[in-house]
Amino acid sequence: LVPLGTQTLVLMMQREAAWRLTSEERSKDRTPLGITLQRMGTLRKVRSVSPGAFRPIPRVDSTILEIRIQRHRSLGQDPSWRALVRGSFAQRRKTLLNNWTGGWGLSREEACERLAPLGLPFTARPEELTLDQWALLAERFDWKRRGGPLPEEGPA
């Protein structure tokens, strides 16, 4: 996701894309990429750029976005993390419970067991989770293996 040694990215993008990447929990605009980037560092909207700054003039507003990578550099390549966020957002209007039972074939009981430590109701949607709650889910389960628990570590 980020080239080795890169600490800061400065990108210009359509305003709506910047909103989705920087949206906070409980926002319907939240996306898997935005959550991943927020776990990796800080995102800051530097400034808006009006359509008049370009030739030909586009029909969209732009935003300059600064991304400072401070932690979890390889998060975007982690297959378990990618499976977790993609599977959780598989069908936007569905709850986490319904996405997990449909996408991974977990039983309703198994899906409820994964939600319980977060203290969330079973009606929770993926955009409602905090970054800490996403981290907890990622640490507890190997999501690329149909949401199963992480394998026990054997003797070294």
Model-derived features with residue positions:
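Class I S-adenosyl-L-methionine
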Residues: 1-126, 136-156
